[in-house]
Amino acid sequence: AFQKDGIFRRSRRLICFDMDSTLIRTEVIDELADRAGVGEQVREITERAMRGEIDFRESFKERVALLKGLDVSVMEDIAVNLPITEGVDRMMTILKRVGYKTAILSGGFTYFGNYLKSRFGFDYVYANELEVENGKLTGRYTGEIVDGQRKAELLRLLCQFENIDIQQSVAVGDGANDLPMLNIAGLG
């Protein structure tokens, strides 16, 4: 993409990443669903959402509900075996060295975002929180759903909090729910 040269272009200071199929080479909800024995059902709901039959929020609620009863130890096993996108470790080392603030803004789950944060040193993680009771997923989530609009809102809030002009931000993602964030970032 061509961009107008200027001081803001040369001094990017915040970079926000999607997680699933961006920092990692999988969709965590599919991994969880396969372990819960509901992989086909979850993929069917995802396809309905992609066809526009249901929106992201509704598809999210339906897919999370199918995870009810899954033991949290499965999440730990999936986390330590996540297929990391090639170059993430080197990229994070360089971004930290040059002073970037880094964030994961994901429609996935905080458990896995926090794993990547501790492994690679991300500054922030915003994702969806799965509700757990007695060591099992309840099939519910807590807090606000992180969808495309929420990602854009979080990017704005991080820029304000870090006192960074939004033109000095970068957003990286792979899907339709990343478009709002990509559209408002200085580079997306």
Model regions: which residues?
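A generic alpha-helix surface/boundary motif
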Residues: 26-27, 58, 111, 153
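Active-site phosphate-binding/coordination module
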Residues: 7, 33, 123
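C-terminal cap/substrate-recognition subdomain and adjoining C-terminal extension
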Residues: 74-188
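Residue-level recognition of short loop/turn positions
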Residues: 19-20, 51, 134
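Non-catalytic pre-domain segments flanking phosphatase-related domains
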Residues: 1-17
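Asp-based phosphoryl-transfer active-site loop
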Residues: 12-29, 182
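A metal-dependent, Asp-based hydrolase signature
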Residues: 28-97
